[in-house]
């Protein structure tokens, strides 16, 4: 996606969020469109998470930078990209990062597609296991849309976020970094997307700056349950 389209998409998303805020909560019955991460506030840890990947080039760059810094992250990947780039998924796994489900085709849960959404989760779990040999229990539902009934039905734990620097609609790495470092606090979950060069640059700079400030980067399972 080029910069112009990314900016337009970002503006549209912000307008939609503003409309929702003005008219009040949208009720989809048992569907939750937003959520809050529940975290332990007793340690100075943060989790860096990446959605939508892997990317054939930028994810490799990111993995190299994280390995150089001895930092572990969490990657919520789509089933389509697992099938397209299994060798990168294997590298993510072998490097010690946590892998989570992001549906097969980045499908958002709505009031009318619950069965399709569920099948995308199941299919993605299957293709991830084919590559890593391990089951996946963490999911980041696209756009934060989730149905609590799926947690027991599919044995999946949803992971949302506390900081979103909107890296996917920016070509300004320094601005992305600033959006994170001025807001971050212990136990935050940072949302980013490993599909863009600017994200890789920004993510590694975020790691460098927050490490100097005494933060420890952990995977989301460590943050939520250790």
Q: Model-derived features: where do they sit?
A:
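Active-site beta->alpha N-cap acidic-glycine motif
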Residues: 26-112, 116-117, 123, 127, ...
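Catalytic domains of cell-wall/extracellular-matrix polysaccharide-remodeling enzymes
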Residues: 107-216, 221-226
């Amino acid at each position: 996606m080029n910069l112009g389209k990314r900016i337009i998409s970002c503006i549209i998303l912000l307008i939609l969020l503003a409309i929702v805020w003005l008219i009040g909560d949208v009720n989809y019955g048992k569907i939750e469109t937003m959520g809050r991460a529940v975290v332990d506030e007793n340690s100075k840890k943060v989790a860096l998470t990446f959605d939508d990947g892997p990317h054939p080039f930028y994810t490799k760059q990111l993995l190299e930078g994280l390995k150089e810094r001895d930092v572990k992250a969490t990657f919520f990947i789509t089933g389509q990209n697992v099938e397209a780039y299994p060798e990168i998924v294997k590298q993510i796994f072998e490097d010690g990062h946590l892998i989570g489900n992001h549906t097969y085709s980045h499908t958002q849960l709505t009031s009318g597609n619950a069965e399709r959404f569920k099948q995308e989760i199941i299919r993605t779990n299957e293709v991830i296991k084919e590559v890593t040999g391990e089951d996946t229990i963490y999911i980041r539902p696209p756009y934060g849309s989730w149905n609590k009934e799926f947690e027991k039905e599919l044995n999946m734990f949803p992971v949302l976020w506390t900081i979103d620097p909107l890296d996917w609609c920016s070509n300004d790495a320094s601005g992305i970094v600033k959006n994170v470092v001025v807001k971050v606090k212990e136990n935050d979950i940072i949302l980013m997307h490993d599909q863009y060069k600017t994200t890789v640059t920004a993510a590694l700079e975020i790691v460098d700056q927050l490490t100097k400030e005494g933060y420890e980067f952990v995977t989301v399972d460590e943050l939520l349950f250790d």
